């Protein structure tokens, strides 16, 4: 079995852990022990998954497909950015300067530059379906970079800026986790998911779903009423702990 296929099988296996931990954190009460443990498991599993993805890229190069490997690295970068944002926005929620430090700026610059490069490659793809897929991924990365630029400009424009960042990152992770699992694991069962147009449709569907999820989460958790509830709950927990 080639390096590529070994890494692909590992990707599907770890991806299952990623999917389960994502929904464990998503469905748990926010801020609860289960929520935090699910989130921690998700970050650790994603770190392993992204490492495997880079091995997959090496396998692609060894199989004589460097263009696909380069694209694979770009997809990995978008996930690295979103996982970093999801973790660091909570870890440094009281320190916007640390959150927007050099790692954030480095990831922003890398994603913006790589996204523009990938977008420039789209018209050169040999098939219309691949043009559409590469364009969709480029737009995804550039949209994330635009959100990062907005945060660099606005900084801590509200007391719950960190939650806005966390929700944005988790919406991106939602799309990445489910699109990857649908395409990679699904294509091993359904032959239709190997078709480039079908894969593009799946990707775009999850991207649109992620946008809808982020808009809903913003209304659910960032409204003045939600902030008041969080303050009351925090005070109650502090009182119970005291």
Locations of regions flagged by a protein language model:
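Alpha-helical membrane insertion/targeting regions
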Residues: 1-242
């Amino acid at each position: 079995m080639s390096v590529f296929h070994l890494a692909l099988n590992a990707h599907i296996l770890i991806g299952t852990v990623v999917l389960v931990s994502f929904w464990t954190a998503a469905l748990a009460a926010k801020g609860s022990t289960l929520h935090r443990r699910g989130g921690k498991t998700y970050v650790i599993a994603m770190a392993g998954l992204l490492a495997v993805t880079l091995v997959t890229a090496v396998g692609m190069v060894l199989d004589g497909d460097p263009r696909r490997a380069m694209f694979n690295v770009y997809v990995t970068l978008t996930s690295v950015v979103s996982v970093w944002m999801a973790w660091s926005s909570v870890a440094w929620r009281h320190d916007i300067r640390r959150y927007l430090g050099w790692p954030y700026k480095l990831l922003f610059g890398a994603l913006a530059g790589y996204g523009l490069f990938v977008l420039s490659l789209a018209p050169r793809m040999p098939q219309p379906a691949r043009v559409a897929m590469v364009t969709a991924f480029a737009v995804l990365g550039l949209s994330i970079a635009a959100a990062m630029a907005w945060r660099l400009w606005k900084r801590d424009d509200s007391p719950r800026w960190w939650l806005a960042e966390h929700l944005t990152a988790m919406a991106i992770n939602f799309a990445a986790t489910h699109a990857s699992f649908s395409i990679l694991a699904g294509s091993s069962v359904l032959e239709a998911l190997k078709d480039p147009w079908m894969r593009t449709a799946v990707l775009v569907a999850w991207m649109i779903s992620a946008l809808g999820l982020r808009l809903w989460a913003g209304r659910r958790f960032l409204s003045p009423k939600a902030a008041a509830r969080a303050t009351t709950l925090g005070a109650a927990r502090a009182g119970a702990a005291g």
